[in-house]
């Protein structure tokens, strides 16, 4: 249903008519659908969702730096394999579907408010800047509730890794969710 919600947006057809990836980031895993010239090339599920990363890698006594490094290494290894198997060229676009994605966009200073299409380089730069802060400061900056606080670090690292490892020129975060897909259906 998340897919239907983004596919119903006017910009979607134009983006997937190029080389694009639609990435639905969930708690247990992510689903990546690769498009080329308007056609689906593949859809793959990977077990690197935000809750899974937290539960798998967050250990008592582990320093914050070590925790972040473990998440990054784990994600990067998975994405290197994905890239080798399924991507033969740089992507033009990545479309992210996830609740945190819109929080990241809202935290950025965009040239045109409401236009959630941004250069990947700018998006990654913002995530790097954000990740240098303490978790509490990130929560404040993004106006998040504390019930999501444990997932913010895995989310930032995951979004950054996806944007850099899949090497897209631009990122689009339409800010849709499953409820939008239900309404569209």
Task: Describe each model-derived feature in a short phrase.
Residues 29:
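Active-site-adjacent helix-turn-beta-strand microarchitecture at beta-sheet edges
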Residues 1-19, 34-36, 42-185:
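Helical "lid/coupling" subdomains associated with nucleotide-phosphate turnover
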Residues 24:
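Conserved catalytic-loop position in the HRD/HxD motif
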């Amino acid at each position: 249903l998340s897919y239907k919600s983004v596919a119903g947006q006017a910009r979607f057809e134009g983006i997937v008519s190029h080389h694009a990836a639609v990435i639905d980031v969930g708690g247990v895993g992510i689903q990546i659908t690769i498009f080329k010239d308007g056609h689906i090339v593949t859809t793959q599920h990977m077990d690197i969702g935000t809750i899974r990363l937290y539960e798998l890698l967050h250990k008592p006594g582990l320093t914050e730096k070590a925790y972040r490094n473990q998440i990054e290494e784990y994600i990067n290894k998975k994405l290197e394999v994905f890239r080798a198997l399924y991507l033969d060229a740089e992507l033009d676009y990545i479309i992210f579907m996830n609740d945190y994605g819109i929080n990241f966009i809202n935290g950025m200073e965009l040239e045109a408010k409401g236009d959630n299409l941004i250069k990947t380089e700018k998006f990654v730069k913002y995530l790097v800047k954000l990740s240098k802060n303490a978790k509490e400061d990130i929560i404040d900056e993004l106006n998040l509730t504390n019930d999501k606080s444990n997932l913010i670090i895995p989310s930032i690292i995951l979004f950054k890794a996806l944007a850099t490892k899949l090497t897209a020129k631009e990122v689009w975060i339409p800010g849709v969710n499953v409820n939008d897909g239900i309404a569209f259906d």
